[in-house]
Regions:
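Alpha-helical, largely C-terminal catalytic domains
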Residues: 1-126
């Protein structure tokens, strides 16, 4: 890996860290507003707990999709369903934000991660 590639990967990680500050409309059991990474962590944990009940799934792919599915929210936050309007295209906005975040990465990795997000958004995988 050359220095430019390494810098791009580190830049991506730094930019996606903004996700830690994104709050969702959901709340924890204690009543505190949940962050997007907390939501993602719980989703990954649920996937692990139910993995044995879904033996036909590609578990590695499932976990990757869990991690990537809300990454675009790092730039403009979460838009809860109750705040969406007919004019607002949450999917397109999040995809564009994800593309912006991925820009620092090598092209093959960009394509791979965007394909995972598209898989999630279009419900391609079982």
């Amino acid at each position: 890996m050359d220095n430019s590639d390494l810098r791009g990967r580190l830049e991506f990680i730094q930019e996606t860290e903004k996700l830690k500050d994104v709050l969702r409309s959901a709340h924890t059991a204690q009543g505190r507003q949940e962050s997007t990474p907390e939501h993602t962590w719980r989703l990954c944990l649920m996937a692990m707990i139910f993995q044995d009940q879904l033996p036909g799934l590609d578990f590695e792919r499932v976990l990757k999709i869990c991690v990537i599915h809300d990454l675009g929210e790092a730039l403009h936050g979460d838009v809860p369903a109750v705040r969406q309007t007919a004019r607002h295209n949450k999917s397109a906005d999040e995809r564009n934000d994800l593309i912006t975040l991925l820009a620092a990465l090598p092209a093959p990795l960009q394509r791979n991660l965007l394909a995972l997000w598209d898989d999630y958004e279009n419900a391609v995988s079982p």
